[in-house]
UniProtKB/Swiss-Prot annotation:
It comes from Deinococcus radiodurans (strain ATCC 13939 / DSM 20539 / JCM 16871 / CCUG 27074 / LMG 4051 / NBRC 15346 / NCIMB 9279 / VKM B-1422 / R1). PANTHER family: PHOSPHOENOLPYRUVATE SYNTHASE. InterPro entries: ATP_grasp_subdomain_1, PEP-util_enz_mobile_dom, PEP_synth, PEP_util_AS, PEP_util_C, PEP_util_CS, Phosphohistidine_dom_sf, PPDK_AMP/ATP-bd. It catalyses: pyruvate + ATP + H2O = phosphoenolpyruvate + AMP + phosphate + 2 H(+). This is Phosphoenolpyruvate synthase.
Amino acid sequence: MDMIRPFGTLRMTDVEIVGGKNASIGEMIQGLAQADVRVPGGFATTADAFRLFLRENQIEEKINAKLQALDVNDVNALVAAGKEIRGWVEEARLPAALEDAIRQAYGEMGDDPDVAVRSSATAEDLPEASFAGQQETFLNVRGIEEVLNHVKLVFASLYNDRAISYRVHHNFEHSEVALSAGVQRMVRTDLGVSGVAFTLDTESGFRDAVFVTSSYGLGEMVVQGAVNPDEFFVYKPALEQGKKAVLRRTRGSKQKKMIYAEAGGVKTVDVDEAEQRAFSLSDDDLTELARQCVTIEKHYGRPMDIEWGKDGRDVQIYILQARPETVQSRAGRTLERFELTGKGDVLVEGRAVGSRIGAGVVRVVKSLDQMDSVQDGDILVADMTDPDWEPVMKRASAIVTNRGGRTCHAAIIARELGIPAVVGTGNATRELHNGDEVTVSCAEGDTGYVYAGRLDFHVNRVELDAMPEVGMKIMMNVASPDRAFSFAALPNEGVGLARVEFIISNVIGIHPRALLDYPDVPADVKAQIEEKTAGYASPRDFFREKLAEGVASIAAAFAPKPVIVRLSDFKSNEYHHLIGGPAYEPTEENPMIGFRGASRYRSADFAEAFALECQAMKQVRDDMGLTNVQLMIPFVRTVAEGQRILEILAANGLTQRENDLKVIMMCEVPSNALLADQFLDLFDGFSIGSNDLTQLTLALDRDSGLVADMFDEQNEAVLALMGMAIKAAKAKGKYVGICGQGPSDHPALAQWLMDQGIDSVSLNPDSVLSTWLHLAGEQA
């Protein structure tokens, strides 16, 4: 009977011997070392050794009897039983044969090396069961006596309250689950950084990205949810092509880190402010980490959940453990979309986990002994949650925490339970009070919101494999990059309108000319710029990188389908609201027909700002390889202006038809339809902007409520101009679509456009399914 097995002798076929976690470590050491996946070595105790331990100490039957009589839904009884059983295990002695084997194996690792002692259950990490965090991990364990003691503590952790409850609710017999202790050489992440990576997007299931969370020090802070980490997405196709692959970065607060304590074990300390303001991983680090993660995913043939660390001494990236991802991998082909229809005040916001909505009564829980106060359907609010809280998490309709990121245990369990969670709010326990009725929404992108009151929402469900054919392409209007992955799951033929205004106003938030003039700007503007651009090489780099990240996120989500990116079309009053904006913007009587679109691009005052936009688009297409991005020019008044814009694009490295670059023109000024042949000689196609075309055809100010009742995209004059544009494009064999609000609001207009032979309609995501089915019904 083997008492221990070196990691290097293990494969995934040994799960029954050393549990899922340790078998996976062995699999990577044996199977992936040649692929330069770096995994620290060590050894594992066996399931046989654990069972021998229980038998020799005559506690096996006693434990089983206690558990058989336990009602795990009685939280107080669960806590008492777990504590008693763990006491029996901790007081027991390790069998002599096991102790001798551990002494020898640890001795062979060197002179009292610091190790992590990890738990690995024999039922853990099977594809259908996530036991994430159910047992303990102990870090910076040094010396044989400490190792022996911590092996016993790991054995006891099989009977943690959360582990007992989890087994019952997932129909595992307690007696059939054994524990293996993994003793693994520590990576000095206390001097570096660490975190968690998933080889898909955890919220949408998007498979072409690696999602990484990262913070300073030992990884337990990220796993426990004790810190708000940095977040990154890395694009797999770009990685494989050797292109710039980092899709998106979000800087976390990273206020604390866990490091070695002087006498062994660990302690938590504050992170320097300069480190908090910087990103914890460079692009080179992210590329190397993602490469190892993708290699692991390919080896296992399924999405993976991976803990990693960067050693602060040798600055290498190491893989600490890997397990199958168990939530999105089980998702079927039925699309479920939650949509908030009611309105309320936002009380707190944080990182969204999942894409659902939940409503209920707030229950603030400050410690484990308050767990039994949580009733079915409550909103569980806490500073942070620990896997120990799992027995009551399943009662909640939503979870809200002050701390934590989207890869902490609380987030993983919330996803598995199918309930929304908003983590890392910073102030939930202060702003939310027991008895408050609230609605928790994770259906609005990366940011999750807690609203006052019980708000109305509805759920749309559709079988994706059952969508009927329609006679034209249904595309989508997308503004928010952080919703692109989930929007891409809807039936679609690409993006007919990607709006960069959302990225500039909501993500960048600073007038581009203020960034260009930095540091020669007013003191208050300078301070705001420095705060927002922390972590980037310069304010200019911040603008270019953030705009590129936003566009790339949308383009990657829908690739290889076309993504038509409309370059900025802010009006002067809209630019005025950005940080630093008032110094650069004129006061116009009617900005709707003023300094906007193409006229801005050719203005000497705006030329350098437009060049930044062009640099971002060039980065997305050339450096990241996302050549599905097509450019669209808004509000072109004259043919000469259109020609000038193409020259400006070329001067900025965006030459039409080079590297398959298509440049589309918005058809939204009546002159565009009236002189369609001339405009189409210049551009690769039209996208009809029904909002502005209606405004300018009927001489109606879209911003004026006094004439709003006359605004009608289906007015015969507007339809006549649309018809002219479609006919001209068809005659020249050029693309013609529509991206205005009209078809989203009026399915009959979409039907009329289809009858005219338009190539595509681009709809708001919330109207894609209804319009698609309406058009299919009209055809039937």
